């Protein structure tokens, strides 16, 4: 009997340990699998997709490049198909230029991306849009290559 109890305790411990490795946040397996396929990663804020500036915008611009709009529309529709109807869109910039200008630019870029999601069926109240300007760089702004990485818009499934 004691042998069976020990075996049961060992199995229960392993299951508990492994379940921590398979954290999906609050999502089901299919939702998490789709997000991973799209390039999302699980972060402290939620499932996050980083959209680099060079793919979406021209330098110092907040209008989406026409070639990128269909990909954002498809992403929006796919999120809705998987009942992922609440998102946060966050704009970021590098540290070149006036901080208040960068803050405004990050807000405009996030708003532009949000508008595409609204046009493809997201309800306005289910999208939180914000700019963080220069406040959260991915890497130090010590080179042009690093500054490019810091100019981005993140889509977050909270």
Each model region followed by its residue ranges:
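Short, well-ordered coil/turn elements that cap or connect secondary structure elements
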Residues: 16, 35, 82, 122-124, ...
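Periplasmic peptidoglycan-binding/anchoring modules of Gram-negative envelope and division proteins
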Residues: 34-36, 41-42, 56-90, 118, ...
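Early exported N-terminus immediately downstream of N-terminal targeting peptides
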Residues: 49-55
């Amino acid at each position: 009997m004691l042998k069976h109890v020990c075996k049961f305790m060992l199995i229960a411990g392993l299951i508990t340990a492994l379940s921590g490795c398979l954290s999906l946040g609050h999502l089901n397996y299919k939702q998490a699998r789709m997000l991973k396929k799209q390039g999302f990663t699980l972060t402290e804020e939620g499932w996050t997709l980083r959209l680099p500036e060079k793919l979406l915008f021209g330098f110092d611009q907040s209008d989406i490049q026409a070639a990128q709009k269909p990909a954002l529309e498809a992403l929006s529709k796919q999120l809705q198909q998987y009942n992922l109807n609440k998102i946060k869109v966050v704009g970021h910039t590098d540290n070149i230029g006036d901080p208040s200008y960068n803050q405004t630019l990050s807000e405009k870029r996030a708003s532009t991306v949000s508008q595409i999601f609204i046009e493809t069926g997201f309800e306005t109240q289910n999208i939180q849009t914000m700019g963080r300007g220069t406040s959260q760089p991915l890497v130090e702004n010590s080179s042009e290559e690093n500054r490019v990485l810091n100019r981005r818009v993140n889509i977050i499934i909270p």
